[in-house]
Amino acid sequence: MAVKIRLKRMGAHKKPFYRIVVADARSPRDGRFIEEIGYYNPVSEPKEIKINNEKAEKWLKNGAQPTDTVKDLFKKNGIIE
């Protein structure tokens, strides 16, 4: 089973809010997920990012592949170099 760490879009029309989730790569963007590990709010000033570092590191060690956007968020939080 290929596992990805990616963003799940939520929020109102034109006001996106994203949850950072671990999901099977075959499931739809806003579909089923295995575990929620944080959230990202690009609308608020300043942009709000909250990630559970322990869960993120656990999933990365288990082979989960982050998407490009999530990889950038992890770099900002110091989870990966």
From Swiss-Prot:
Belongs to the bacterial ribosomal protein bS16 family. One of its GO terms (biological process) is translation. Keywords: Ribonucleoprotein, Ribosomal protein. Signal peptide: none annotated. This is Small ribosomal subunit protein bS16. Pfam families: Ribosomal_S16 (PF00886). It comes from the Bacteria. It comes from Alkaliphilus oremlandii (strain OhILAs). GO terms for cellular component: cytoplasm; small ribosomal subunit. The keyword Coiled coil does not apply. GO terms for molecular function: structural constituent of ribosome. The keyword Nucleus does not apply.
